[in-house]
Amino acid sequence: MAKKPIVVDFHSHILEPYVQKMAAGRTVTSGFGAQAEMPRPPGSRREQWFRQMMEPEAQIEGMSKMGVDMSVISSSTVIQWTGWASPQTQLDLDRRINDMIADWVRRFPDRFVGCFSLPLKDLHLALPEMERAVKQLGIRVANLPASVEGVYLGEPRFRPFWEAANELGVIAFIHPDGVQDPWFQKYSLWNSVGQPIEEAKVMSSLIYEGILESFPGVKIVMAHGGGYMPHYHGRLDRNVTNRPDTMANIKHPPGWYLKSFYYDTCLYDPTTLDALIAKVGADRILLGSDFPVGETDPVGFLRKAKSVDDRAFAQISGETACAILGIPHER
């Protein structure tokens, strides 16, 4: 029987029941405790989402309906954010998440690739957990927020993390865990506007602080297509013309580094995907649905973009993801 290419979804979420219960009322979905959590009555769409994030069989069923062969699964940090906890408690919660993800991968190795979570408030705890995830659990993708306690990931505080990630061959998947500014709670703007802003901020941090210069071998995947950053970088490049001192840590204009990132397709608008492809190339883009709460037909979405020809479709739907994950593209 002839082999065929597989479709890989790089952006799919899970929930660990105990961690989710502990996080209830403490995350961005409740305004960090300012309002009640949304109910999920039996039979509701929200109840189905939670089941798909807690039960691997339910997630696999959803994947198959979408035409997805493998999913890279990460904690839904907007629902079960662990940053509310003390560093030691956060470590305990993140370990529960990582162990659950490793169990899903062990039980269904042909369907899941794992992402591990880290208590980044304390690198003395986070770095050993990263080593455990890689060497004991066999997970090579880190599920990272945009910032920790208001400090973005490019800052010197996190350089030891990037050094260790580089040594361990870790892939970084950056997904903001929600904006704490209460202004964004109205109309759920934390999700529609706040997340793309956070992605632009963390990308700026990584570029300007020289992380991409120092660790070019670390592959960084941006959720939600990198937010606003890829579409407004001209202002950054223009700024360094007037202020060359802002290039203290970089050798090129900021926009040059856009092709150093990978981006998922969780954009919801085919013309935005076309614009992203024009900026960075189809070989830097990975299919990502934000399952189960996001794009319901991620494969069909690719076909709606005018710039996605057969070659680009192959790259985005799975070829590039398999290459950076080190797994076969055909089965």
Residue ranges and their predicted role:
Residues 91-95, 102:
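Portal/gating segments that form or line small-molecule/metal binding sites
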